[in-house]
Amino acid sequence: MMSKRFLWLAAWLTLFISGPVRAFDHTHRSWNELLVRHVVVSKEGYSSAVRYAGMQSDRAALKRYLMTLEEVSPRDYESWGKGQQLAFLINAYNAWTVELVLQKYPDLKSIKDLGSTFRSPWKKK
């Protein structure tokens, strides 16, 4: 009887201490929702443009998505298939680029204005 109680208590404490484990959303649903709301595709379908004013108003949602990216450990990333890894990298690159633009928005005319001749905007600390 005592050992069952001990095992139950140990299992409960393990769950309590470790906290909830959230699996990474490989559908990137929250990022896709932002894109649906704030990206306009050209009539021809060959290009698109971000509506940064709208994205700025949804910045809290963008930051929440970026936090989910930051929570991915190298071990988790390495356990994914190549397609999931590629989707993660592409979506992370694009989401962080939007965040970089929003840091200077609305005073920014072009993303190219973020850097300089000798310094990439992506190497900024």
Which residues does each predicted region cover?
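N-terminal mature-domain "stem" immediately C-terminal to a signal peptide or N-terminal signal-anchor/transmembrane
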Residues: 22-68
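Detector for Asparagine
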Residues: 4, 32, 91-94
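Bacterial N-terminal signal peptides
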Residues: 8-16
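Bacterial N-terminal signal peptides that target proteins for export
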Residues: 1-9
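Acidic/His-rich structured neighborhood in mature extracellular/periplasmic domains
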Residues: 59, 64-125
